[in-house]
Regions:
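Boundary regions of SH3-family modules and the immediately adjacent low-complexity/disordered segments
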Residues: 1-13, 18-29, 36-49, 56-96, ...
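Solvent-exposed, polar/charged alpha-helical surfaces in well-ordered, non-transmembrane soluble domains
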Residues: 210, 214-218, 241-245
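Catalytic cysteine-centered active-site loop
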Residues: 223-238, 242-251
C-alpha cells in the first residue's frame, strides 16, 4: 500500500477517474473534494492501475482515500508519493497549519523569492532552529516543503495542527472512518470527540464551539465553489468540515 502528500496548494479530488461527465444540461465536473498542501492520503490504486472494482485508471490518475475518509481520484502531478516510514516520520514532525493565504519565500524577508503560494488549511513542517537563528529572523518560521526544499513563512500566518492524519494507515474497505482513526489512536470511536475537546479546550464544550465559530468566520467573503475546501472557493460540506478539522475534530 502506498501513501502520498498533496504537493500543490489546492489539489482536486474527483469522484470518478474522469474529470467531467455528461449531465442533464451538458458536461459537468466530477469534482468531489479538495486536498490541501501537505495533507496525507492513502493510495488505493497507483496511476494506470486497476482498482479493486475492476476499473482501469488513466496513466496519470491515482485512486486515493483522504486522511478523513474521502474516496476519489487525483492527478498524480498533484501528489508527492511517500513510503510508509516516510509518512510516519512526517506526521511525527512539528506540523503547523497555514492559517491564511500566505507565501513561502526562499529568505526570511519580504524581498525573498516566492517559492509557493499556500491557501488556508495547508500543512507545513516547521524546522528546528537555534535561539540565535530564530532571533536573527524574528517573525519568520523556517519550514520544510514536501519536495525537501526549505522556505520561510511569516509566524503570524501559522497555527497549530490540532487534528490527526494517522487514519491513512488503518483505513480499509468496510471499516468506518471513525473506527479507523480510533484504531491508530488506541481508543474507541465514541471517545474521539471528547478526547479532542479535552486535549485542546480543557474539556469545555463551550470553548470548543466558540473556536469552531471563530475558524468559520475566517472564510467570510469566500465564494461558493462546488467541491471546494479553500479560500479560493468552498462549498457547504467543505466549510463545515474545515472549521471542525482546524479545531481538532474530523467529520
Amino acid at each position: 500500500m502506498k501513501y502520498a502528500l498533496f504537493s500543490v496548494p489546492v489539489g482536486t479530488i474527483y469522484d470518478l477517474p474522469q474529470t467531467i461527465k455528461e449531465g442533464e444540461e451538458g458536461l459537468v465536473s466530477t469534482i468531489g473534494d479538495e486536498g490541501l498542501y501537505g495533507q496525507a492520503c492513502q493510495v488505493r490504486t497507483a496511476p494506470g492501475g486497476v482498482t479493486a472494482a475492476g476499473v482501469q485508471l488513466p496513466p496519470d490518475v491515482a485512486e486515493v482515500v483522504s486522511f478523513y475518509g474521502y474516496h476519489g481520484y487525483v492527478d498524480q502531478r498533484e501528489l508527492q508519493f511517500v513510503r510508509e516510514e516516510e509518512l510516519w516520520e512526517y506526521l511525527g514532525a512539528d506540523l503547523v497549519l497555514v492559517g491564511r493565504a500566505t507565501d513561502v519565500l526562499n529568505l526570511p524577508k519580504v524581498q525573498g523569492v516566492r517559492m509557493m503560494e499556500l491557501e488556508r488549511g495547508g500543512v507545513l513542517r516547521r524546522q528546528p532552529e537555534t535561539a540565535e537563528e530564530a532571533e536573527a529572523h524574528k517573525g519568520w518560521a523556517k519550514a520544510l516543503l514536501t519536495d525537501g526544499r526549505t522556505g520561510y513563512v511569516r509566524d503570524v500566518a501559522l497555527e497549530p495542527v490540532k487534528y490527526e492524519m494517522t487514519a491513512v494507515f488503518s483505513q480499509r474497505e468496510g471499516l468506518a472512518f471513525n473506527d479507523a482513526l480510533a484504531e491508530t489512536l488506541n481508543t474507541t470511536a465514541d471517545k474521539l470527540v471528547p478526547e479532542a475537546v479535552a486535549r485542546w479546550y480543557g474539556g469545555s464544550e463551550d470553548a470548543f464551539r466558540a473556536a469552531v465559530c471563530e475558524q468559520a468566520k475566517k472564510y467570510m467573503g469566500t465564494e461558493y465553489r462546488w467541491g471546494g475546501k479553500s479560500g479560493r472557493g468552498i462549498d457547504c460540506s467543505g466549510f463545515v468540515s474545515s472549521a471542525y478539522m482546524q479545531c481538532g475534530v474530523l467529520i
